Amino acid sequence: MLAMASVEELWAKLDGAADCKSLLKNNLTKERYEALKDKKTKFGGTLADCIRSGCLNLDSGVGIYACDPDAYTVFADVLDAVIKEYHKVPELKHPEPEMGDLDKLNFGDLDPSGEYIVSTRVRVGRSHDSYGFPPVLTKQERLKMEEDTKAAFEKFSGELAGKYFPLEGMSKEDQKQMTEDHFLFKDDDRFLRDAGGYNDWCSGRGIFFNTAKNFLVWVNEEDHLRLISMQKGGDLAAVYKRLVVAINTMTASGLSFAKRDGLGYLTFCPSNLGTALRASVHMKIPNLAASPEFKSFCDNLNIQARGIHGEHTESVGGVYDLSNKRRLGLTEYQAVEEMRVGVEACLAKEKELAAAKK
């Protein structure tokens, strides 16, 4: 039963997997393993907690999670190497957070005609600095964290005011409605499961959303908090402002979020840290998507294009999810700006290709 395997058993499985191409396999050398295998974080986390999922799922892309915020210090030898490779940065020099001046944003509605952009969404991940991540969290700690979070939700006012729905004991009607709204999160990811992400499911987990349903927070899904602002159309400014006001409100309520110098905001998976921000649009680009240069066009703009139902899904009706690729090494405002520039370039190219067909 490898689910409870020792660090030695996990290492043996990883070390013997010649075909494994994960970042964990690439960066956890024998020397690093020997230096880290007996260390513990202040939350009681171990190397085994960090690498379990990547050793059980040898087809992982990343293969390593941080067991808690302190893991980024205690296991920095391997985590820093993984972070540099994943985020394609030579050194870890993430700037201080900078959301920009909300009264002087460099963007507004990216598609006033409403012809191309179906919807716009910006989300961030945040972690409480006083709690561990899923592998080390007890059920009691998760429930206490949920209470701390709910107290912060009470501070939301105006358009952010809403209601919190715990997953545990949720009525069938609420479940059905949230599934239809695409708000509900599930426990069906094997990588996350083996990392401890679904321990004590579904206790201490829930969803907050405002009355207009254009702002929501996932509590204890993968990260402690995922704050999501979204709406139909292309008004990036409105979506971004709503999110920033929500983040500032939660911080002002007394919540303290985990950060580390050079890494920015810390998340369970090292692929999300830094700004921990993903800004995206669902956009109709059938002509651009059909062109052979589509991928390189997006790559040159630091834009990730994927199907509207998430990673590794196909487009539906020429609609693609376009988002900022970079999370680390730039400010929040710069990340959103980079997405804005990329989306506008895709929009211009789509119009040009459509006109050429006439």
UniProtKB/Swiss-Prot annotation:
GO molecular function terms attached to this record: arginine kinase activity; ATP binding; creatine kinase activity
InterPro entries registered for this protein in UniProt: ATP-guanido_PTrfase (IPR000749), ATP-guanido_PTrfase_AS (IPR022415), ATP-guanido_PTrfase_cat (IPR022414), ATP-guanido_PTrfase_N (IPR022413), ATP-guanido_PTrfase_N_sf (IPR036802), Gln_synth/guanido_kin_cat_dom (IPR014746)
Top-rank taxon: Eukaryota
One of the GO biological process terms: phosphocreatine biosynthetic process
An annotated GO cellular component: extracellular space
Keyword Protein biosynthesis tagged: no
One Pfam family here: ATP-gua_PtransN
Phosphagen kinase N-terminal domain location: 6-88
Keywords in alphabetical order: ATP-binding, Kinase, Nucleotide-binding, Transferase
EC number: 2.7.3.3
SUPFAM superfamilies, per database record: Glutamine synthetase/guanido kinase, Guanido kinase N-terminal domain
Domain Phosphagen kinase C-terminal: 116-353
Reactions catalysed: L-arginine + ATP = N(omega)-phospho-L-arginine + ADP + H(+)
Annotated binding of substrate, by residue: 61-65, 222, 269, 311
UniProt similarity note: Belongs to the ATP:guanido phosphotransferase family.
Subunit structure: Monomer.
Name of the protein in its database record: Arginine kinase
Lineage of origin: Eukaryota, Metazoa, Spiralia, Lophotrochozoa, Mollusca
